[in-house]
Curated annotation (Swiss-Prot):
Protein name in the entry: Cytochrome c oxidase subunit 6, mitochondrial
Organism: Neurospora crassa (strain ATCC 24698 / 74-OR23-1A / CBS 708.71 / DSM 1257 / FGSC 987)
Metabolic or biological pathway, per its Swiss-Prot or TrEMBL entry: Energy metabolism; oxidative phosphorylation
Taxonomic superkingdom: Eukaryota
Gene name of this polypeptide: cox-6
Entries under InterPro entries matching the protein: Cyt_c_oxidase_su5A/6 (IPR003204), Cyt_c_oxidase_su5A/6_sf (IPR036545)
Length: 148
C-alpha cells in the first residue's frame, strides 16, 4: 500500500508519455559520422609585407609596457627577423612608454634572431640614426667586458 502512495505522489512516470523514437534510414545516420572532415582549418598564409604592416600598426597603438612587451614577444616568436620598420616602430613605442630596458633588449632580440654577425651589423647600421635620436645604448656599449 505504501508503494501505491509513493507512486501517486510522484505522479505519472515520464516513460508513460514518452514519444516513440522512429527508426531512421541508414543513409540519414551515416551523414552524422564521417571519416573525412567537411570543415578544414585552412588559414591564410601571411606574407612578410602583411606581417610588417600588422606589427607596425600594433606598435603604433602601444599605450603601456605590457602591450609593448607582448607585441615584441609575438613579433620575435615567428620564424623570421622583423623588418627594420617594425623594429623602428617598436623602439619608438618603447621610448613613448618610457621603457629604456626594453628598447635595449630589442637589439638583443635582433642579435639572437639573425643568422650571422653580418646581418646584425646591417640592422645596427640601418637603425643607428633612430638609436642615436632616441638615446638608446646597446648592451655591448653598456657592458663591454661581456661582449662576445
Amino acid at each position: 500500500m505504501a508503494s501505491f502512495f509513493r507512486t501517486a505522489v510522484r505522479g505519472p512516470s515520464a516513460g508513460l508519455f514518452r514519444a516513440v523514437a522512429r527508426p531512421q534510414p541508414i543513409a540519414a545516420r551515416v551523414s552524422l559520422f564521417s571519416t573525412s572532415s567537411r570543415f578544414r582549418s585552412e588559414h591564410h598564409e601571411e606574407t612578410f609585407e602583411e606581417f610588417t604592416a600588422r606589427y607596425e600598426k600594433e606598435f603604433d597603438a602601444v599605450q603601456d609596457v605590457f602591450e609593448l612587451q607582448r607585441n615584441l614577444n609575438n613579433a620575435f616568436a615567428y620564424d623570421l627577423v622583423p623588418s627594420p620598420s617594425v623594429l623602428a616602430a617598436a623602439l619608438k613605442a618603447a621610448r613613448r612608454v618610457n621603457d629604456f630596458p626594453t628598447a635595449v633588449r630589442v637589439f638583443e632580440g635582433i642579435k639572437a634572431k639573425v643568422e650571422n654577425k653580418g646581418q646584425y651589423e646591417q640592422y645596427l647600421a640601418e637603425l643607428k640614426p633612430l638609436r642615436e635620436e632616441l638615446g638608446i645604448t646597446l648592451k655591448e656599449d653598456l657592458y663591454p667586458e661581456e661582449a662576445n
